[in-house]
Amino acid sequence: MTNYTGYLQLSTEKKRGKTIAQDMYFYGAFKLMNPFYLNNDEQACFYIMNPGGGYVDGDTYRMDIHLAKEAQLLLTTQSASKIYKTPKNPVVQEINITLKEGSLLEYLPDPIIGYKNSRYKQKTIVHMEKGTSLIATDIITSGWDPKGNLFSYHMLDLNTKVYLEDNLILLDHIRLTPGSQSLSSIGQFEEYSHLGTMIVVSEYTDESLISMLYDVMETQNLKCRYGLSMLSKPGFMLRVLASSTQEVMRAFDICHKLIRMKWYKRSPVFLGKY
């Protein structure tokens, strides 16, 4: 096995009406907290921690997440992913997710913060069987600079592939290189600083849901730009441009709340972060 800076493996299964950890293993700069259950629900919730506090030059990370039949998992992080300067090699993170029949994964990580002169590459591959559901988000901020400048990182590269029954149904590649792109120009970020992406794949998705989401979002006085797009298979993608993490999260929360109530009769998730 490759010697990663941080490695995490989590396999879950449904047993006696609750989702439990069938197998859990981690080492290095990754750690999993013990699961908890919101409102005594069957869905297991886990926090991923990075005890090191941030990602540095040449770090490599890998997560392998597996949900057995009818398992339900909410996976989040304890804090933002801080990418410090990388003078030689980029930070690389691989995320591999497998969802078996009838399972549900809500993957809600904190924002990515690229510090000045940092480089980060993330590759996410999701394999879904029929009847599974995925809700996954990513937030990219304008980064951190000691002088307060925006977009002073070298590169943020996020590549996501989702397969349903071994067929590629979504390929999303975001590559931001401020040195060669004018990210504040027309057609880019313009006056905004944060980019949010929510991916939802589920056979429960239909056009009436998209219309409902648009209707609700239009009443919320959101201070952002957003767009919803249907996928080739039942599912959608939400893109958000905003000026803060909080505004991106407001848009995400509206969609997430409606989906949880409509599909699973569950109350909204409040993780107490933003």
From Swiss-Prot:
Cellular component GO terms, alphabetical: cytoplasm
Keyword terms of this UniProt record: Chaperone, Cytoplasm, Nickel insertion
Main location per the UniProt record: cytoplasm
Entry's Gene Ontology molecular function annotations: nickel cation binding
Pfam families reported for this sequence: UreD
Statement: the UniProt record of this protein carries the keyword Chaperone: yes
Keyword flag ATP-binding: no
Source taxon at top rank: Bacteria
Cellular localization per UniProt: Cytoplasm
InterPro entries associated with the record: UreD
Subunit structure: UreD, UreF and UreG form a complex that acts as a GTP-hydrolysis-dependent molecular chaperone, activating the urease apoprotein by helping to assemble the nickel containing metallocenter of UreC. The UreE protein probably delivers the nickel.
Xref: PANTHER family: UREASE ACCESSORY PROTEIN D
Family listed: Belongs to the UreD family.
Protein's job: Required for maturation of urease via the functional incorporation of the urease nickel metallocenter.
Protein name per Swiss-Prot or TrEMBL: Urease accessory protein UreD
Biological classification of the source: Bacteria, Bacillati, Bacillota, Clostridia, Lachnospirales
Gene encoding the protein: ureD
